[in-house]
């Protein structure tokens, strides 16, 4: 889990395609892990517990989740739905220093394969267009029938006096339920747009895939957002990566692959293929006698995101019993017979792999993630965060 994340799905270690059951399971697991009773005196765990509960409160509610997926968290916080959509309330950042334009936001999930192989992807967006039949007023007489209670603001301010103090409380207008128009004039609603003032249609558009998709995942489509004050505002597409089997993301934004091997392969060597999302086949070679340490992470240069490093770690299935052959010569072949079977057979020597896609583990840079090992090289340790464990090697659930 990325503890700095503000995306509600990432906080729960999920993607936007997660089912209701996935959300329930992830919430229960993380709530137990970060519960204050188990993390006394740990302010980071306490803060994470709050984030987990907040994320669950939105994603476990189907209506709130729908609004969040379409418009973002600001829309949920302002209690918006399709009938009371208020872009002004939703995007208050327009009025903050340095923000010149109002923007809507939507999320789009992209696979690792598409990220590595495509420069553009097709995104289906909902486009607002002015209703010409009512001149965008929502009424057949083309007049703006604003709510008489709130004067078209959708909200009212009530004052509560408490002694010498006056408290102001902002609420949805009771006259129009936040819809801003005179609800008593429904008989004048435009039949074409059903009183919305706009017509919605779906449009498929080509969008550039961000190169630095983790730190800068946004692409802005000018004039493709909701209809506000007589024009379409800009639409911000936020790309979210969906990870393939075996691939995850570390806390410091490194792509990591977990290879599963059996005990004999940790000592007797192997030749295995990683199906990289770029379409390349990466040949991983361990020579007989090279010992695979489950605490080590191996670094594959230029095979990660943004041409960065790909991390490779191993999950080792240990044998329950070892059978020592009698009167056998001690060699790797007989050692493997004693230790058990391989996880998968080795690939052949000649499979046509490009030289730059062949990685011998004995020649790769390594990170030792074992905090109890004091023999680590200090320079290597500091390069990856120090303190006996490289910074960010922990993986977010996907």
From Swiss-Prot:
Zn-finger region bounds: CR-type: 118-202
PROSITE patterns noted in UniProt: DNAJ_1, DNAJ_2, ZF_CR
Transmembrane domains' residue ranges: none
Gene Ontology MF: a single term: unfolded protein binding
Cofactor: Zn(2+)
CXXCXGXG motif repeat boundaries on the chain: 131-138, 147-154, 173-180, 190-197
Region (Disordered): 364-398
Cofactor note: Binds 2 Zn(2+) ions per monomer.
Gene3D superfamilies for this protein: DnaJ domain, Heat shock protein DnaJ, cysteine-rich domain, Urease metallochaperone UreE, N-terminal domain
Short name of any one Pfam family annotated for the protein: DnaJ
UniProtKB keywords: Chaperone, Metal-binding, Repeat, Zinc, Zinc-finger
PANTHER family to which the protein is assigned, alphabetical: DNAJ-LIKE-2, ISOFORM A-RELATED
UniProt-recorded name of the protein: DnaJ-like protein R260
Organism, scientific name: Acanthamoeba polyphaga mimivirus (APMV)
Lineage, opening ranks: Viruses, Varidnaviria, Bamfordvirae, Nucleocytoviricota, Megaviricetes
